[in-house]
A protein has these predicted regions:
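RNA-contacting regions in translation and RNA-metabolism proteins
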Residues: 1-43, 52-75
Length: 75
């Protein structure tokens, strides 16, 4: 799941080497934290959060396939 978010974020940003994705297990869910360069944050979030929401949906689908729950945080 971490690789999926990393691939999508690197494809969206103009500075792909600044993309940092960390994964941590917090109780019954997996938390994926996505860090991007400040100038790329708008591209990753998208208008009215549409891109971020689409990434969260894809992450949720991947998590269900693995039988877990996942949350995406963009910082």
């Amino acid at each position: 799941m971490k690789e999926l978010i990393e691939f999508i974020a690197q494809s969206l940003t103009s500075n792909p080497e600044a993309v940092k994705v960390t994964e941590s297990d917090e109780g019954d869910q997996i938390v994926i934290r996505l860090e991007v360069a400040p100038e790329d944050k708008g591209k990753v979030i998208g208008r009215q959060g549409r891109v971020a929401q689409a990434m969260r949906v894809l992450l949720r689908v991947a998590a269900v396939k693995d039988g877990t729950r996942a949350v995406l945080e963009i910082v």
